[in-house]
Amino acid sequence: MRTIKVGSRRSKLAMTQTKWVINKLKELNPSYNFEIREIVTKGDRILDVTLSKVGGKGLFVKEIEQALLHQEIDMAVHSMKDMPAVLPEGLVIGCIPKREDPRDALISKGHQKLDGIKEGGIIGTSSLRRSAQILAERPDLTIKWIRGNIDTRLQKLETEDYDAIILAAAGLSRMGWKDDVVSEFLEPDRCLPAVGQGALAIECRESDEELLKLFAQFTDEYTQRTVAAERAFLHAMEGGCQVPIAGYASVNDRDEVELVGLVASPDGKTIYKETAAGHDPEEIGKRCAAMMSEKGAKALIDSVKQELDQDGK
């Protein structure tokens, strides 16, 4: 009987997600044993600067992927939005379970909604994507960077000068806190989610046929199709945490994958937004990226990256 070693970050949310996946896999095949290996990533260690300044995407997965490649673990559970567009050679996303709530959630003092927050109010987020879209709607607000796990950020809202913070609804839901703390859910037409937000990525070695066979029973086709379009868009735009980029796909009544892509300037003053639909998720993602690039989105991404490079020198 095989014991499957599962890599996970140490945070409460990461461990909750990993244990949920293990329980589901045990239901599918009770003959496997699972053992969790906690791994500390660079993103967990560096908490005093914004993600965009320390390398963006991959910060929460690189050490875990190294453990996979060195066969120290057999599989890993990640938040899909943390996954870079391109994986290391030899690794695959073996499974994408059914997506949780993809929306962003506003948690505020006094349970105020976004339009009720006072002029000049301070919003805490560590995401350029969120801050750009919030500033586009409410340019009078002040963005203040906030880092740390979900529980740390909720504590900072209470003890520091934030009027509100924005978190992924999925994380709050998985922790069982969504109903208690959320002041307002920000719908995708108002704040477009990050690529893959709300979905989990179960990563393993491409050569592990036994695990891939087990995972095949756990993959959600709807989530797989929509996330594939979003990730193709991210890859084509060459975006990461350094740039305000968003992508969210759904399946329309013609059974087509319909993707909305967005690229913004960090101040929210310039926003490019396009929609593409079709049956091939990869093609849709690339087409949406091409449409936006023609209008100037790619040039905006390059200029934002250049500014960040100069700031870091």
From Swiss-Prot:
GO BP, sorted A to Z: protoporphyrinogen IX biosynthetic process
Q: Is Nucleus one of the keywords UniProt gives this record?
A: no
One GO cellular component term of this record is: cytoplasm
Q: Which Pfam families match?
A: Porphobil_deam, Porphobil_deamC
Biochemical pathway: Porphyrin-containing compound metabolism; protoporphyrin-IX biosynthesis; coproporphyrinogen-III from 5-aminolevulinate: step 2/4
Q: How is the cofactor bound?
A: Binds 1 dipyrromethane group covalently.
Q: Extract the GO molecular function terms from the UniProt entry.
A: hydroxymethylbilane synthase activity
Alphabetized InterPro entries for the sequence: HemC (IPR000860), Porphobilin_deaminase_cofac_BS (IPR022419), Porphobilin_deaminase_N (IPR022417), Porphobilinogen_deaminase_C (IPR022418), Porphobilinogen_deaminase_C_sf (IPR036803)
- What's in the keyword line of the UniProt record? Porphyrin biosynthesis, Transferase
Known catalytic reactions:
4 porphobilinogen + H2O = hydroxymethylbilane + 4 NH4(+)
Q: Which cofactor does it need?
A: dipyrromethane
Q: What is its EC number?
A: 2.5.1.61
Modified residue S-(dipyrrolylmethanemethyl)cysteine is at which positions? 241
Top-tier EC class: transferase
Q: What does this protein do?
A: Tetrapolymerization of the monopyrrole PBG into the hydroxymethylbilane pre-uroporphyrinogen in several discrete steps.
Question: Belongs to which family?
Answer: Belongs to the HMBS family.
Q: How does it assemble?
A: Monomer.
Against NCBIfam families, the record matches this protein to:
hemC (TIGR00212)
The extra comment attached to this record reads: The porphobilinogen subunits are added to the dipyrromethane group.
Q: What is this protein called?
A: Porphobilinogen deaminase
Q: Which organism is it from?
A: Bacillus velezensis (strain DSM 23117 / BGSC 10A6 / LMG 26770 / FZB42)
